[in-house]
Curated annotation (Swiss-Prot):
Residues 33-45 have a biased composition (Basic and acidic residues). The gene is pmd1. This is Leptomycin B resistance protein pmd1. Residues 1-91, 375-788, 1073-1362 are cytoplasmic. It is found in: Membrane. It comes from Schizosaccharomyces pombe (strain 972 / ATCC 24843).
Length: 1362
């Protein structure tokens, strides 16, 4: 399906081309987006194919080029064989040691069965009146064996636990590294269809699944396998015929597993894929959070997110059914075979073919073996998840990228002249195959000359830069550098010769100095001394006109720029980016809209820097503001992928063609003299650039921009404060910036989401106390989300079924002890009858346990899936409830939020579902065996139970050790994940700077700390776990020794002894197994504490609040600022507004102008009530905006920003998303007509049902902007806010959009911010901001006459002729 007809090719935005071939959006049902899919679709790819063959219109050769750029490559090998291939020799040694010791530890229980058989013979002999004289000696002798086994099991358990944890972390670390390396190796076209949220999920949640499947659980599997195998070996040696009967359970159990695992695997893969898809949606929502606030779409977006969760829940329930039946079947077979074995064993015993020692030895050996197999079943989910998660990761790792900066192949580019030629280029974006962007396009860019590209959006300008950078390959024609085809050149060496400056420069979270050095290739940087490097940086800064303002910063070149440079203004970021571009003295300089979003003063300064940088090098410039390219050697006018005309500025004016019309549209043809006059005035002015405040650029700053994308990297303020105390206290305006400490030191782990609403100066201790809750509170909090009756019933039935499972152990003990008692009199006439009766008891127990385990697993998992889905939905809505201040904080990045919604919720499984069922099973077991043992024989019961605190204490300290390191591990891994997310979200910048190797190296370094922490944690926690494992055998020794004493004295009989022994020993053993879940419980408790903290935190501006004055419609929509003072909450030291006074009358169209950082966008933020002012008041209709109900108030306002936000879905869905109530088709069409977009929409293949693509990527800037205007108008707002609504558009698009805005402003109060003064000349009143106050106010004509600050802006833009 084509989103654009061929007639509209020229209007397609060429720089936004990420429409997925398999679009992850479904046509809507009325207002809400729909994400419902069939299970088959979701389990395979979770997408709906728009076309069968998107490239069918191209030749086979062209199709191959396109497919190579976007298609995935299925992994040649996946699963555990592939995972284990990442082990080096040390890992192999660790795993080998772990395997051997795991097997050694697994031998302990079967060996115990041998000892138990010998002791059982001695006890039955004593009960039948035989061997009384040697009884105590025999018992003492065999009790010593228990002690020897205990020592061996303790040592082996410790070794296998530690070695597998360490080896698992090391292997998972290499997979993480390989995955990021593969991601950084991909061509840019691959990222056009891959969501940033999906990368984050893969590198966090999925790699955590892999690590979990490689840790101590692997050791437990070898332990269980060894127990199983050795148990049967011992049993066969003791009596093969009897053991063969017991062995019949093995094929039956394997058959059940064989049927269940494939179904479980399929649904696990489906669930993982849906969660990854939902992460992309989360990233899309929170990247544009201000838009959600402005239009009040939180509930709609939450419902859309919930549809992803429902799909994931469906997979989880399907998985639960299979898991429940499989586990139930395993226990049914086990208990059924026990009944069969004792039935046949009694006959063999009666016939004299078997003695009691062999029968009991074989039984215990097989019993222990089968239990060991059953103990694997709860771990199976970890292994299935591990293998499923690895599949997607290895698909990416194995993908062969056609353009790979890591590959050494290709001719190395060294000394070049810099001549670029595009010859007969045919180009189409792989994710938009229906649009031919360049058609037989040819252009020569001479060496050392400036070539400028102009034309409408979608005409192919940015594509040319992408081809020169070799971000893409054309499907036809060639791109030459000095006569050599780019495809024959080494990619990295090619990009080392090129520097790119983009419209939205990306700076990294480090110092100004480091950001500039990133422009130097490593081959050069490594050869420079410290002094030479500093000289280069300073020279580059001076060339970029950045040196003077850098020297006024708090730490000068050592000043940290903040995440994505948000502490810098737009002009400052741009000039740092230019310095970064020119430091390597590139032969080729590419400038893509480098000044379009700047105010006039910044533009003049930046343009001078660009003019300086362009001298003596090949330069390609894209510009919508023609004033910036009038001096170019060759100006190329591009339209619909073809060159319309080219020549110098004057030559093209003489032609009076397309270029002349563009010039006329911008009213620049007569402005050269005035432009020169302004530049001369700037030359005469002092070189120090006036800075209102450090980074106080509320148009370009992430903190204040109304449509700023969320930053994707995180910091940890605690670690940071320590560093600041040591050396990095930054003082500015005589104030210590402790509260912006998280921006001063880069690349540190983020605070968890739970910490996000805390005051910056709170200590680590106070933060920890705020979040830390005990296990009971966490359990109550998680299950407080059980809401529906079916969930309550499932939870109660699941608990009851789990308790029945737990009660099996004491029932088994009572049956076994009484069964053993009949062996004391083999000559009894009713012996065989008694054997038959007890065999039936075993069969009944088998049937009960089948239903109990099946129902327990299914019911608990059903309830868990519902609860976790609801908690995830609740957390999503809670995050959407937070105010803008919350998202301004550096720790609340998109990466952190996406990770929290994925991994934190996943962690809650440790206190819910099957794990909770296991807890009730164990609790029931402990209580019931205690009651049974005390009722049967209180003396032996008390002595044996007195040892249980040893196991409990060992388990407690293991949990405590894990608890202490879990927080450090979580923060450290989140740091590395956030760094990876930041780098991949800025992949074009990373690629253009050729920084892939550096990013990869930094990421590898960031994984070292968590690896070290994991090793230390394993050494501590493994000690306590091993103690819990070994002490079981000591308890056996004590029980047999004391029991023998009681029996020898005649106080106990054999029934009493074996009832107490089996009940307590096996019961305590199972209690010890629960501590194997301690790591999961720790993670769940920490996650629940953070989510609970966030849930209970109330934002200052609360959209859930019902308080405040209700307003259905504003009366006059008059706006007044009275002595307003304001500082952003995260930058209290910087005053943005300093006593602002202004009045906007009802129905007026007013404009705010001024330099960056003067407070313009801040006023819109205050009108929208994104923030509350510090002093003074903002009044609308004479009422303080604080007194209105926030939701009712925002319904009266509509916002159109510089970067319009569109979501995945159809055009219709995106438009009606802005409606404050249900709207009719006619109302929607009327809004579109006013926005000048209706006719265009009708021309689309599916009209209003045409898909927009991710973030509206299939539409041009002008088209997206007009849809955003329609979305604003459908609200029928009383107040319309326009924040740089046309600044990033080309002249044609700007004209069309401006006409739509003019129509939209009729009959309502309109506030517009604009750098292009031509768009606001007709305003009723123009307010000129300067330093947070109004410097001038009046109409355009009045302000021009005053010859003040506004007049300077007019002259700078050549508008005084108007």
């Amino acid at each position: 399906m084509s989103l654009h007809s061929k007639k509209s090719t020229s209007t397609v935005k060429d720089n936004e081309h990420s429409l997925d071939l398999s679009i992850k959006s479904i046509p809507s049902n009325e207002k809400n987006f729909s994400t419902e899919k069939s299970e088959n679709e979701a389990s395979e790819s979770h997408v709906v194919d728009v076309v069968k063959d998107p490239f069918e219109q191209y030749t086979p050769e062209e199709q191959e080029i396109l497919y190579k750029q976007i298609n995935d490559t299925p992994a040649k090998l996946s699963g555990y064989p592939r995972i284990l291939s990442y082990a080096d020799k040390w890992d192999i040694m660790l795993q080998l040691a772990g395997t051997i010791t795991g097997i050694g530890a697994g031998l302990g229980m079967p060996l115990m069965s041998l000892v138990s058989g010998q002791l059982a013979q001695a006890f039955t002999d004593l009960a039948s009146g035989k061997g009384a004289s040697s009884f105590q000696h025999t018992v003492d002798h065999f009790c010593l064996y228990f002690i020897y086994i205990a020592i061996g099991v303790f040592g082996c358990s410790y070794i296998y636990t530690v070695t597998f944890i360490i080896a698992g972390e090391r292997i998972a670390r290499r997979i993480r590294q390989d995955y990021l390396h593969a991601i950084l190796s991909q061509n840019i076209g691959y990222f056009d269809r891959l969501g940033a949220g999906e990368i984050t999920t893969r590198i966090t949640t999925d790699t955590n699944f892999i690590q979990d499947g490689l840790g101590e659980k692997v050791g437990l599997v070898f332990f269980a396998i060894a127990t199983f195998v050795s148990g049967f070996v011992i049993a066969f040696i003791r009596h093969w015929k009897f053991t063969l009967i017991l062995s019949s359970m093995f094929p039956a159990i394997c058959g059940g597993i064989g049927l269940g695992v494939p179904f479980i695997t399929k649904n696990t893969k489906g669930q993982i894929a849906v969660v990854a898809e939902s992460s992309t949606f989360v990233e899309e929502v929170f990247s544009n959070i201000r838009n959600a606030f402005a239009f009040g779409t939180q509930d709609i977006l939450a419902k859309l997110y919930n549809k992803y969760l429902i799909t994931a829940q469906r997979f989880g329930i399907n998985k639960a059914i299979a898991m429940g039946l499989m586990v139930g079947w395993m226990f049914f077979v086990a208990y059924g075979v026990y009944g069969l074995a004792f039935w046949e064993g009694g006959r063999l015993l009666h016939a004299g073919d078997l003695d009691v020692s062999k029968l009991i030895g074989c039984f215990f050996a097989v019993l222990i073996a089968s239990y060991s197999l059953a103990n694997i079943s709860p771990k199976m989910q970890s292994f299935v998840s591990c293998a499923s998660a690895a599949k997607k990761i290895f698909d990416t790792i194995d993908r062969v990228s056609p353009i790979n900066a890591f590959t050494p192949t290709g001719d190395v580019v060294k000394d070049i002249k810099g001549e670029i030629e595009l010859k007969n280029i045919r180009f189409v974006y792989p994710t938009r195959p229906e649009v031919l962007v360049l058609d037989n396009f040819s252009l020569v860019c001479p060496s050392g000359k400036i070539t400028a590209l102009v034309g409408a959006s979608g005409s192919g300008k940015s594509t040319i830069i992408g081809l020169v950078e070799r971000f893409y390959d054309p499907i036809g024609g060639q791109v030459f550098l000095d006569g050599k085809d780019l495809r024959t050149l080494n990619v990295a060496s090619l990009r080392n010769q090129i520097s790119l400056v983009q419209q939205e420069p990306v700076l990294f979270a480090t110092t100004v100095f480091e950001n500039i050095t990133y422009g130097l290739p490593d081959t050069i940087k490594g050869t420079l001394s410290k002094e030479e490097l500093e000289r280069r940086v300073y020279d580059a800064a001076k060339l970029a006109n950045a040196y003077d303002f850098i020297m006024t910063l708090p730490e000068q070149f050592s000043t940290n720029v903040g995440q994505r440079g948000f502490l810098m203004s737009g002009g400052q970021k741009q000039r740092i980016a230019i310095a970064r571009a020119v430091i390597s003295d590139p032969k080729i300089l590419l400038l893509d809209e480098a000044t379009s979003a700047l105010d006039s003063k910044s533009e003049v300064l930046v343009q001078k820097a660009l003019d300086n940088a362009s001298r003596s090098r090949t330069t390609i410039v894209i510009a919508h503001r023609l004033s910036t390219i009038r001096n170019a050697d060759n100006i190329v006018v591009v339209n619909a992928g073809k060159i319309v005309e080219q020549g110098s500025h004057n030559e093209l004016l003489d032609l009076n063609g397309a270029y002349a019309r563009l010039v006329e549209a911008q009213k620049l043809s007569g402005g050269e003299k005035d432009q020169e006059m302004v530049e001369e005035e700037l030359e005469d002015a002092p070189r120090e650039i006036p800075i209102t405040s450090f980074g106080d650029d509320d148009e370009d700053n992430d903190m204040a921009s109304l449509e700023a994308p969320m930053m994707s990297h995180n910091t940890d303020t605690d670690t940071l404060n320590n560093k600041l105390n040591e050396k990095d206290n930054v003082v500015f305006e005589d104030k210590t910036l402790q509260h912006v400490a998280s921006e001063i030191v880069p690349n540190l782990p983020p605070a968890d989401v739970g910490e996000l609403n805390e005051e910056p100066k709170k200590s680590k201790k106070s933060k920890k106390n705020n979040h830390e809750i005990n296990s009971l509170t966490a359990l109550w909090f998680i299950h407080s989300f059980v809401r529906t009756m079916i969930e309550i019933i499932c939870l109660l039935i699941g608990i009851l079924a789990s308790m029945i499972c737990g009660a099996a152990y004491p029932v088994q003990a009572a049956v076994f002890a009484r069964f053993l008692n009949i062996f004391t009199d083999l000559s009894s006439t009713d012996f065989l009858h008694k054997v038959n009766v007890f065999a039936v008891y075993w069969l009944i127990l088998a049937i009960v346990q089948f239903f109990a385990y099946a129902i327990s697993n299914f019911a608990m998992t059903y309830a868990m899936e519902a609860v976790l889905q609801r908690i995830r939905y609740h957390l999503f809505r809670t995050l959407l409830r937070q105010d803008v201040e919350f998202f301004d904080r550096s720790e609340n990045t998109v990466g952190a939020i996406t990770t929290s919604l994925s991994t934190k919720i996943q962690s809650l499984e440790g206190l819910s579902g099957p794990t909770l069922g296991t807890f009730f099973q164990i609790l029931t077991n402990i209580i019931s065996v205690t009651i049974l043992s005390l009722a049967t024989g209180w003396k032996l019961g008390l002595v044996t139970l007195s040892t249980s605190p040893v196991i409990i204490t060992a388990g407690y300290y293991r949990v405590r050790a894990l608890d202490q390191v879990q927080e450090k591990l979580s923060a450290a891994y989140k740091e590395s994940a956030a760094f990876a997310c930041e780098s991949t979200s800025a992949i074009r910048t990373v690629a253009s700077l050729n920084r892939e190797e550096n990013v990869f190296a930094e990421y590898c370094d960031s994984l070292i700390k968590p690896g070290r922490e994991s090793a230390i944690a394993s050494l501590k926690s493994g000690l306590f776990f091993s103690a819990a494992q070994g002490v079981t055998f000591l308890i056996n020794a004590l029980t047999f020794w004391y029991g023998s004493t009681l029996m020898r004295k005649g106080e106990y009989n054999i029934v009493q002894f074996y009832t107490c022994f089996i009940a307590i020993v096996f019961g305590i053993q199972q209690a010890g197994q629960f501590f194997g879940y301690s790591a999961d419980v720790t993670k769940a408790k920490a996650a629940a504490g953070e989510i609970k903290y966030l849930s209970e935190s109330k934002p200052k501006i609360d959209t859930w609040s019902t308080e405040g004055k209700k307003v259905e419609s504003l009366q006059s929509a008059a706006i007044e600022f009275r002595q307003v003072e304001f500082s952003y909450p995260t930058r209290r030291h910087i005053k943005v507004l300093r006593g602002l006074n202004l009045t906007v009358k009802p129905g007026q169209f007013v404009a705010f102008v001024g330099s960056s950082g003067c407070g313009k966008s801040t006023t819109i933020g205050l009108i929208e009530r994104f923030y509350d002012c510090d002093n003074g008041a903002v009044l609308v209709d004479g009422v303080n905006v604080r007194d209105y109900n926030i939701n009712d108030y925002r319904k009266q306002i509509a916002l159109v920003s510089q970067e319009p936000t569109l979501y995945q879905g159809t055009v219709r869905e995106n438009i009606v998303l802005g409606a404050s109530k249900d709207v009719s088709e006619e109302e929607m069409i009327e809004a579109c007509k006013k926005a000048n977009i209706h006719e265009f929409i009708l021309g689309l293949p599916n009209g209003y049902n045409t898909l927009c693509g991710q973030k509206g990527s299939s539409l041009s800037g002008g088209q997206k902007q007009r849809i955003a205007i329609a979305r604003a108008l459908i609200r029928n707002p009383k107040i319309l806010l326009l924040d740089e609504a046309t600044s990033a558009l080309d002249s044609h698009s700007e004209k069309v959009v401006q006409e739509a805005l003019n129509a939209a402003s009729q009959g309502r109060t309109t506030v517009a911010i604009a750098h292009r003064l031509s768009s606001i000349q007709d305003a009723d009143c123009i307010f000129v901001f300067d330093g947070g106050v109004i410097a001038e106010a009046g109409t355009h004509a009045e302000l021009v006459k005053q010859r003040g600050r506004y007049y300077e802006l007019v002259v700078e833009q050549g508008l005084n002729k108007a």
